[in-house]
């Protein structure tokens, strides 16, 4: 059903990914077939597959370059859903996770920074979060943030006085902007790879993900599974 669509120019958007109208149509069919978000718990409308089940399904769905996003198993949403389900409070899951699982919004992980900030080494992150009157004030710069231009929900990693801390914010909040969409070689994920500037973004403490100072551990948990799922998908190519 999906693989033949790769043969038609009309299936692609200008960034060489599946166009949104076609994607939405296929996603409805995937949901009707009961194969939507298979990596999520049954209690959150998934199939409850563990790593072994995921490996078999992810390999097969990536026989097509369109496959993972059609099943809601593509990066960065895949890893973001995993860590929100594992770390988030129930209130955070309802607000930030469920809309991603349902396919209502996309998400992004804002971690990587230009030099001298944290690139491959998150411990070098310079983006700063300062606590004041129940809110965290964010200032700094990120780049190569996958999917940012199409995302509504963001996980942000910033430096606090006790180490690194993870936060959640919505695209409509003031105090941040996408400076540019960075060109890359080959097809792009929906939302591209973007440079982001934070200038006084305010995040209430209720939208902190996990404990203060535990952000590095949180993203390593998230990235650990993401590295495995990338391999699962690549085997299918």
Predicted regions and their residues:
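Short glycine/proline-enriched turns and hinge-like loops at secondary-structure junctions
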Residues: 49-51, 120-123, 147-152, 189-190, ...
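Glycine-rich phosphate/pyrophosphate-binding beta-alpha loops
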Residues: 116, 143-149, 187, 225-229
